Amino acid sequence: MFEKLYQFYDFYSYFVFTYFINVFFHYVIDISYYDISSKYKIIPLPKLELLNLYQKYLPVVVKNVIISPIPFGVIAVHLVNLDSLYTTRFHITDCIFELVLTATITEILFYIFHRIVHIPFLYKRFHKLHHSVTTPVSVATLYVDQWDMLFSNSIPLVFPVFFICSTTITAKIWFIFILTESILSHAGYKYLSEAHNKHHTDININYGNNLFMDKLLGTYG
């Protein structure tokens, strides 16, 4: 039990580390290179106002990444066998196949779970906090209710890794990819963030990450 918890939190700590490295990178670009980065923002803000957004969202994000893994870890160790991730040898062909499969399953699950939290009752109770973000900024990626964090983020984005990926290397590559993609979609840059920013202004479109489910089911906008 305790060994499994250690294995899970070993992965989760990598997830958190990757998230904050990404956010710090965007923070440096947004603040230290403001004159350049603001030219490419969908909604350019004064530098001080942008800094205030980071300060507003960060405490909630830190609380989420500390508290949410507690119930998630207990659930995960009863459902997932992590031992094979530490014993299976890495092969590049297996890695590519597993990453493609993980990306596909994750997109399907994320779309479904995201649409569920847009059911009016659940939206008002859990998901509305995230949609209070009207000016996109990288740290707001995890500016969510704690149960929203568990249900519509952790489960669809993390669980497929443990069922599909066969090595720790593949799993960690996936974490880098999905977190970078998610943060870029919230970072507020033209072209890179426009699709998800449209979702924050019109909650009936663009539920997915890479949008193939939206195109398939008629919610692409």
Q: Residues of each region from the PLM?
A:
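Functionally important transmembrane alpha-helices
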Residues: 164-216
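Non-catalytic, topology-defining segments of multipass membrane proteins
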Residues: 1-128, 132-161, 207-221
